[in-house]
């Protein structure tokens, strides 16, 4: 009583306290960062190593395996995968959430150093690492195009000037430059001309290498001066290499231009990049795992004018893709939803109280509670994201509940003629414990979420803490500011009603009278109600088992990624044509705004595309509907497949794949894996629950297998090293010399001119100079035949691995796909030597599925414990918790009705319902107990009176919560995929629980009271005996 009086009779102090809370919240809001979701990125580090010319199998055994053994010893590594292709190996290390990325990077460098002695000696450089996840979609893509500069020159500007500067910006983890390679002098040899002149490829290589050197020449010095010696020992351009003498034949000089075409070109001609059908260089920027995407993008944009000034005016630098606009639009939508929710909640209060003066009180209490929460969010290191703003939207209905309960009870005393200050004190005292019970039990619901580990726990923590803080501030405001305002603002009489509102008042009275009559009938037919309650419990279990489930709602971020997978024997020229064809099909779609793509590198048969869709208000279809439409058109393109997926704000794992979900096959027997992977992939491709099934197993590439006749080689005076050097010189784009420039280093690349390597007969034109100086054709000592060879070798841990990726067809959920895959694996009878498991997001979904029921049970148990402590009773908490089955049924039925799978967002809705619907029961039980103790009423009379007296606040709080969540259901635009499942769950649960709990709660109350009396009689009889 004294606590309440302290604030009621000291209005200035109470007002200033509320102002202080509001000011702190405003300051916190201004400093809060903006993000699409809470920080849930796993720390990921990518290790790269190269050995030019080495086969994928050689890279896997000699480079990947030693590194994996050393890196696998690092503490906190949750997953390690590797992919080895022609000349390169990439190892992805995913760490536990609590692992510091900088500390992990130091351990990675130490592990690389420890493995250095086990790596091949021919590696051009030590393995390197980057603190970025290559499977993440870029946060921004910049393109460079020009009508005057070549692709190589553009690549040089991008990699030498732009990429290093962008990499230094806070939050940037990696800048990947694609679409071409660095400039180089290319020497394309004519094998027939070489044969005619008696010049070997090694002769050419040695001559070029000896003619382009950069060595110190020293200095001249006398008594007074010093002269640095400088020579023209370096050749810079193709024109300078052209006249180079490489051999003398019969006294005549054989120049390089006589046997080769020398051009200023690029290091690797098997690279191509495009933007909207125009050749381009792409800068794909990825953020650090812990970085804020909006802040990073803003920093890059602020740097762009300065970057533009560092490159020539003839180069066009454009932003081809930016992830931030849809994120900003989504957050704006949530903010608008929050404002609408606040307005609707206040409207509900006004309709019930029918007094503008009384409505001002919750209209003040709600903003104070919500704004004050921003200060706590800032102190906790949170951000303004979809989940935290959704928490505040839902909190609108909660925070007004406390004010409503206090306000309604005070208003009831005023209507009875009590003086305002006395009514404020008496009314607050009566419901103070009720409000405390409602708030503490609601916060208790989220305790299991706060203790939940892994990605789901990290994802939901901000939501739970934000909502809990809002409820805590609301509790303080409802017991201080609200009664003070009631005592000083409200009058001791019934408020005058406007004529337009009298109809609503009469309707409410009629509804209350009808409820009273129906409640009397229910209390006389308790068995029927008990059966209905048991039926709802059984229905809950059946609905939960049968409802489709997924991890996280599929988002429409306005960005698509596409992976091209062509025949494994395709040439680069043909692959570049496929890229152009696919880009044209997509670019012609009316919903597409921009398309960029690239192909080449170590995997010639693959490519990537990044597609920006038009804003949501400029297209009528969702990203998934656009993908479905494009899939039909793309399927008509022969020789290659383009797999599209919508970019998501959450992606788990470091595997780069062509689809959203992964299923990984592991085996210590590589032959068994290669035998069973095609069988499993073909089986999964037939399942209707899966779409876009593809695999990263590339073991069917075309190979020309040469077999040396060693005896013949020995007789002809040729060794294997000379023969291998011949092949590398001719076909390996061999880098034979370095050109040093002030800003960078460039290579001289030698190979047989592509004009002479169009078919297998090119091998017949190759020859080796033996130890007697004679030209020996390759065909004299080698035979060749076509064969198959892997384009890549993949590991997970230290086991051979193959990952099958898939998307979900429209109307199918991840639970459907998971069950279908498990059935297919059982039907195929896969041997124990081949193990299958879900990876990435699908793996987290499996783990979350196993913990969902436990989490719900833990929340219910926590609420029971809190209520038991508050009521000092084992029975009354059960009465209050009896409201939950009806809410669960309503929520699950609503999800089914809207064809929405049960996701992590829907789980949040279920947890919220546990806190919301029990409020009705708390108000009934509190007043019934009070009536029994002080009114000398029977239990049935007490609960009947409590139900009628609390009918208006129950309707007000329920409708406030319902209208607070309704904008989430009805909202469209960016980010609505996240908001709608939460709103659907809450609205569905509230509607069903309101219909049933008004009747089931009093019945359960009477049931447990009779049970209590029965046990007390037995106890008395036992004592008497």
UniProtKB/Swiss-Prot annotation:
Assembly information from the UniProt record: Part of a tripartite efflux system composed of MdtA, MdtB and MdtC. MdtC forms a heteromultimer with MdtB.
Residue numbers on the Periplasmic membrane side: 30-335, 380-388, 454-467, 876-894, 971-984
Spans through the membrane: 7-29, 336-353, 360-379, 389-411, 431-453, 468-490, 853-875, 895-917, 948-970, 985-1007
InterPro entries: AcrB_DN_DC_subdom, Acrflvin-R, Multidrug-R_MdtC
Protein name: Multidrug resistance protein MdtC
GO molecular function: xenobiotic transmembrane transporter activity
Annotated source species: Escherichia coli O157:H7
Family, similarity comment: Belongs to the resistance-nodulation-cell division (RND) (TC 2.A.6) family. MdtC subfamily.
Organism lineage: Bacteria, Pseudomonadati, Pseudomonadota, Gammaproteobacteria, Enterobacterales
Coiled coil regions, renumbered to chain: none
Gene assigned in the entry: mdtC
Membrane topology field: Multi-pass membrane protein
Keywords: Cell inner membrane, Cell membrane, Membrane, Transmembrane, Transmembrane helix, Transport
Function: The MdtABC tripartite complex confers resistance against novobiocin and deoxycholate.
Inducing factors: The mdtABC operon is transcriptionally activated by BaeR.
Subcellular localization, as worded in the UniProt entry: Cell inner membrane
Cytoplasmic side: 1-6, 354-359, 412-430, 491-852, 918-947, 1008-1025
Gene Ontology cellular-component annotations: plasma membrane
PANTHER family on file: MULTIDRUG RESISTANCE PROTEIN MDTC (PTHR32063:SF34), PTHR32063
């Amino acid at each position: 009583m004294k606590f309440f009086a302290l604030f009621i009779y000291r209005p200035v102090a109470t007002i200033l306290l509320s102002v202080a809370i509001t000011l702190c919240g405003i300051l916190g809001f201004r400093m809060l960062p903006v993000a699409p979701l809470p920080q849930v990125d796993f720390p990921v580090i990518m290790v790269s190593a190269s050995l030019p010319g080495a086969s994928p199998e050689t890279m896997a055994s000699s480079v990947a395996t030693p590194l994996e053994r050393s890196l696998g010893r690092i503490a906190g590594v949750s997953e390690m995968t590797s992919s080895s292709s022609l000349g390169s190996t990439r190892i992805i290390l995913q760490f536990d959430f609590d692992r510091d990325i900088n500390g992990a990077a130091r351990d990675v460098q130490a592990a690389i150093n420890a493995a250095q002695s086990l790596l091949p000696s021919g590696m051009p450089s030590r393995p390197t690492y980057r603190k970025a996840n290559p499977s993440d979609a870029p946060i921004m893509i910049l393109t460079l195009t020009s009508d005057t500069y070549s692709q190589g020159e553009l690549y040089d500007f991008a990699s030498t000037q732009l990429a290093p500067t962008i990499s230094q910006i806070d939050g940037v983890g990696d800048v990947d430059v694609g679409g071409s390679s660095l400039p180089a002098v290319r020497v394309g040899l004519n094998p027939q001309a070489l044969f005619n002149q008696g010049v070997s490829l090694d002769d050419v290589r040695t001559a070029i290498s000896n003619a382009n050197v950069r060595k110190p020449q020293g200095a001249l010095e006398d008594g007074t001066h010093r002269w640095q010696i400088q020579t023209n020992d370096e050749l810079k351009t193709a024109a300078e290499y052209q006249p180079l003498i490489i051999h003398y034949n019969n006294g005549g000089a054989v120049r390089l231009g006589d046997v080769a075409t020398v051009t200023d070109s690029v290091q690797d001609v098997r690279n191509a990049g495009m933007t909207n059908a125009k050749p381009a260089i792409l800068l794909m920027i990825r953020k650090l795992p812990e970085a804020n995407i909006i802040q990073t993008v803003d920093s890059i944009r602020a740097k762009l004018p300065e970057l533009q000034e560092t490159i020539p005016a003839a180069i066009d630098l454009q932003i081809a893709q930016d992830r931030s606009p849809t994120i900003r639009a989504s957050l704006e939508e949530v903010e608008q939803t929050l404002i609408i929710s606040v307005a609707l909640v206040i409207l509900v209060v006004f309709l019930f109280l029918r007094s503008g003066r009384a409505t001002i009180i919750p209209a003040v209490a709600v903003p104070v509670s919500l704004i004050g929460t921003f200060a706590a969010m800032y102190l906790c290191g949170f951000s303004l994201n979809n989940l935290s703003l959704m928490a505040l939207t839902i909190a609108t209905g909660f925070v007004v509940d406390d004010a409503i309960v206090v306000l309604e009870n005070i208003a009831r005393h005023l209507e009875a003629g009590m003086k305002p200050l006395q009514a404020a004190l008496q009314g607050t005292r009566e419901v103070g414990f009720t409000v405390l019970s409602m708030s503490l039990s609601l916060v208790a619901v989220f305790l299991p979420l706060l203790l939940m580990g892994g990605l789901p726990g990290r994802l939901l923590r901000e939501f739970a803490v934000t909502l809990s803080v809002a409820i805590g501030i609301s509790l303080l405001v409802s017991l201080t500011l609200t009664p003070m305002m009631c005592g000083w603002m409200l009058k001791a009489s019934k408020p005058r009603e406007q004529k337009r509102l009298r109809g609503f008042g009469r309707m409410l009275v009629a509804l209350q009278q009808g409820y009273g009559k129906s409640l009397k009938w229910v209390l006389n037919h308790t068995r029927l109600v008990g059966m209905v309650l048991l039926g709802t419990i059984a229905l809950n279990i059946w609905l939960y088992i049968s409802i489709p489930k997924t991890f996280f709602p599929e988002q429409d971020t306005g960005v698509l990624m596409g992976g091209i997978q062509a025949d494994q024997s395709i040439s680069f020229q043909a692959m570049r044509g496929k890229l152009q064809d696919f880009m044209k099909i997509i670019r012609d779609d009316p919903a597409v705004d921009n398309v960029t793509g690239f192909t080449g590198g170590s995997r010639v048969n693959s490519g990537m595309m990044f597609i920006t869709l038009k804003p949501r208000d400029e297209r009528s279809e969702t990203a998934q509907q656009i993908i479905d439409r494009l899939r039909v058109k793309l399927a008509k393109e022969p020789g290659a497949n383009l797999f599209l997926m919508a970019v998501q704000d959450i992606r788990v794992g470091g595997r780069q794949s062509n689809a959203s979900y992964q299923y990984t096959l592991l085996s210590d027997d590589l032959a068994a894996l290669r035998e069973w992977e095609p069988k499993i992939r073909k089986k999964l491709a037939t399942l209707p629950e899966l779409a876009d099934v593809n695999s990263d197993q590339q073991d069917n590439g075309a190979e020309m297998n040469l077999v040396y006749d060693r005896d013949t080689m020995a007789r002809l005076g040729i060794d294997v090293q000379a023969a291998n050097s011949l092949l590398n010189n001719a076909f390996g784009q061999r880098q034979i010399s370095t050109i040093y420039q002030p800003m960078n280093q460039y290579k001289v690349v030698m190979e047989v001119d592509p004009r002479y390597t169009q078919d297998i007969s090119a091998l017949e034109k190759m020859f080796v100079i033996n130890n007697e100086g004679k030209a020996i054709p390759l065909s004299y000592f080698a035979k060749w035949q076509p064969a198959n060879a892997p384009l890549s070798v993949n590991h997970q841990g230290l086991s051979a691995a193959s990952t099958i990726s898939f998307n979900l067809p429209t109307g199918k959920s991840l639970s459907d796909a998971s069950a279908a895959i498990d059935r297919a694996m059982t039907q195929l009878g896969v041997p124990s030597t081949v193990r299958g498991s879900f990876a990435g997001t699908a793996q987290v979904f499996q783990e979350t599925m196993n913990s969902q029921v436990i989490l719900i049970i833990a929340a219910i148990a926590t609420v029971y414990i809190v209520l038991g402590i508050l009521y000092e009773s084992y029975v009354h908490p059960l009465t209050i918790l009896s409201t939950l089955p009806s809410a669960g049924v309503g929520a699950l039925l609503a999800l089914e009705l809207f064809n929405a799978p049960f996701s992590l967002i829907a789980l949040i809705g279920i947890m919220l319902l546990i806190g919301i619907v029990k409020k009705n029961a708390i108000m009934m039980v509190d007043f019934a107990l009070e009536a029994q103790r002080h009114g000398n009423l029977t239990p049935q009379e007490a609960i009947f009176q409590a139900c009628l007296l609390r009918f208006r606040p129950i309707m007000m709080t329920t409708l406030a919560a319902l209208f607070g969540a309704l904008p989430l259901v009805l909202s469209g635009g960016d980010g609505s995929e996240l908001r709608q499942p939460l709103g659907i769950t809450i609205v569905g649960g509230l509607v069903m629980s309101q219909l049933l709990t008004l009747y089931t709660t009093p019945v359960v109350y009477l049931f447990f009271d009779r049970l209590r009396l029965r046990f007390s009689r037995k106890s008395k009889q036992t004592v008497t005996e």
